[in-house]
Amino acid sequence: MIFIKVKVKLKNKDNYFSSKELETIETFIGFLQKNLPLEKDVSVAFEKERNKHMTTGVRLPKHHIHVLAKDRLLIDVLRTLSHEWVHEFQHQKMGVKDTDKIQPIGGPEENMANVLSGIFLKKFIRDFPNHQPVLFGELD
């Protein structure tokens, strides 16, 4: 198996996360890249409030992902990140274009993102049990 190294730029991370949470985020991104590899660099911005285009996250053109972070458990933030990562994969590897009309509820792209993000989170919890307290906000 060949692994492609991509850069993932994290924006606003210091506003919301402890060093242990950042370590978990970085481990999770490595896990995502191993399981659903992207070929192009991506930017992930953690936001304090929703913008008009997102529920808890959104994938934007030019490989940008925005994730609502404020007042959420890390496990919820990572599920959103995983969901949007799948959408980025759909654009980078499956031929989905920014101009394509995507069905926001129940469409194939959205269903794929929902299913895979749940699977990835459960596998991450299983494979990295040492991160579980961080994911669930159970730090001392």
Where are these regions (language model features)?
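Short amphipathic alpha-helical segments at helix-loop
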Residues: 13, 69-70, 101, 105
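Auxiliary, metal-adjacent structural segments of Zn-dependent hydrolase domains
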Residues: 2-63, 125, 133-138
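Short histidine-centered beta-strand/loop micro-motifs
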Residues: 56-57, 69-70, 78-80
